[in-house]
Amino acid sequence: LNLQSTTYQTRGVFPTSFVEEKGKLIADYGQRSIGRITSADASLWWPVLCWLYVKKSGDQSFGTSQQVQRGVQLLLDLVLHPTFEGNPVLFVPDCSFMIDRPMDVWGAPLEVEVLLHACLKSCIQLMELSRKHQKSRLLDQRLVLTRQWVHDLRQFLLKHYWVTSKTMQVLRRRPTEQYGEDQHQNEFNVQPQVVPSWLQDWLENRGGYLIGNIRTGRPDFRFYSLGNSLACMFGV
């Protein structure tokens, strides 16, 4: 938690990596990376690991400590704020993906959004733990907002990322270039020609998967085993 950035530009962000030099921890918040940008997913793991530790060890005093609770609020300030995006996903800029930066995964890559879902759920558990010991109206408001965000995020992922043989058939028949009130039929203006020809035969009728990314006009239909595995683990 001492590595969490407190500067205005990157407040709440965790470094992609850090090194030890002469007894001091030197964190990389993007100043050493290509594009000079830190990884979005690097900041989302610690609440998950923190809650798992508290749950397994029973060390509630650590979960309710001022340092942990402050870290939770800094992270939520970073994630739950007004943006130009009307969706509950976390926008990931180009080069801001710790797992594999050159794979064209900017936008809303599955691994990051699933990890965001787990991160917010863990933050809720840690805040509820704190609320048992100390009442706060601000904390109650943050809990309501975070729960709603988790719900909206899961619904968004199931609606736009989950594909089966049946949904592919529907997607190919949807109208494109829609505007106004009818846009809900094809919100991201997915063109039939961008759907891979092999996808229908590969899916058959046995199941489905979460696609790699959803972007206007050009979803990423690649299958990412890590993102789908995390979705199963985290209850998406």
Residue ranges of each PLM-predicted region?
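Acidic/His metal-coordination segments adjacent to aromatic residues that form catalytic metal sites
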Residues: 16-37, 92-109, 202-217
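Catalytic cores of carbohydrate-active enzymes
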Residues: 9-11, 93, 106, 115-236
